[in-house]
Swiss-Prot record:
The keyword Coiled coil applies. One of its GO terms (cellular component) is eukaryotic translation initiation factor 3 complex. It comes from Drosophila virilis (Fruit fly). Residues 61-112, 174-209 form a coiled coil. It comes from the Eukaryota. InterPro entries: eIF3-like_dom_sf (IPR023194), eIF3j (IPR013906). Keywords: Coiled coil, Cytoplasm, Initiation factor, Protein biosynthesis. Residues 47-58, 68-88, 188-197 have a biased composition (Basic and acidic residues). GO terms for molecular function: translation initiation factor activity. This is Eukaryotic translation initiation factor 3 subunit J. Component of the eukaryotic translation initiation factor 3 (eIF-3) complex. The eIF-3 complex interacts with pix. One of its GO terms (biological process) is regulation of translational initiation. Residues 1-88, 188-236 are annotated as: Disordered. Component of the eukaryotic translation initiation factor 3 (eIF-3) complex, which is involved in protein synthesis of a specialized repertoire of mRNAs and, together with other initiation factors, stimulates binding of mRNA and methionyl-tRNAi to the 40S ribosome. The eIF-3 complex specifically targets and initiates translation of a subset of mRNAs involved in cell proliferation. The lineage of its organism: Eukaryota, Metazoa, Ecdysozoa, Arthropoda, Hexapoda.
């Protein structure tokens, strides 16, 4: 009986392998992933370290044909303008001259306005409605330029006198005094300039030397009846 129990106990004994000796089939895969990631990082670093190539700007060559065409067109326009001017009548030439003169005057006006630091006059004197000091300054520059166009007329001085008088009527006595002082200062400066110019003209006149020829003396004798030529003819 005891032998039977021992036999049964022996038969139930199962030898199991040590769990510590089991080989994990996933073992080492983490190491492979770490190696792969480090390799990818190195590749990215190499890509970043590569110098970036800058593309040189493409130089556009000038179109010689287009340039020549534009020059030819400009030449034809100038030639056509010369022909147009040559075929003009006297009246048309005068009108063209006045047109060019007007353009020049407008250009001079623009230069004057730029000198005074004012803007464009827009629609002319009627377009002005000055309110500020700068706007009155601009209006005055435009009005002065417009009036100065008639300075060559013999009636211009009288016109200015009447204009100043009519404008000063609207001023107080104190303001008129300021205008008077300003005009007197301008008068003094004008006198100095005119005197200096007169002295220069007189100095130039004195510097001129009149030259006389020998024939001038003979002419003088002839004026007083001493005609040697007639005496010689009578002798012959």
């Amino acid at each position: 009986m005891a032998d039977d129990w021992e036999s049964a106990a022996d038969s139930e004994i199962v030898i199991r392998p040590n769990a510590t000796n089991n080989i994990n089939k996933w073992e080492g895969e983490d190491d492979d992933e770490d190696v792969k990631e480090s390799w990818e990082d190195e590749e990215e670093k190499k890509d970043e370290e590569k110098p970036t190539k800058t593309e040189a700007p493409v130089k556009t060559k000038p179109n010689k044909a287009l340039k020549a065409k534009l020059e030819e067109q400009e030449r034809l326009n100038e030639e056509e303008e010369r022909k147009r001017l040559a075929n003009m009548t006297a009246e048309e030439k005068l009108a063209e001259k006045l047109r060019l003169q007007k353009i020049q005057e407008e250009s001079d006006l623009k230069s004057a306005l730029d000198t005074f630091g004012v803007t464009s006059i827009g629609g002319g004197l009627d377009a002005f409605n000055p309110q500020s000091k700068e706007e009155f300054k601009e209006f005055g520059a435009t009005l002065s330029w417009k009036v100065a166009q008639y300075r060559e007329s013999v009636h211009f001085p009288e016109f200015i006198e009447d204009l100043v008088r009519s404008l000063c009527v609207n001023l107080s006595a104190a303001d008129i005094k300021k205008v008077k002082m300003s005009v007197e200062s301008l008068h003094s400066e004008k006198q100095k300039m005119e005197k200096a110019n007169a002295k220069k003209s007189a100095a130039k006149a004195k510097g001129k030397v009149s030259l006389r020829k020998e024939s001038d003396d003979i002419d003088d004798y002839q004026k007083y009846g001493n005609d040697f030529t007639d005496d010689y003819d009578d002798f012959m």
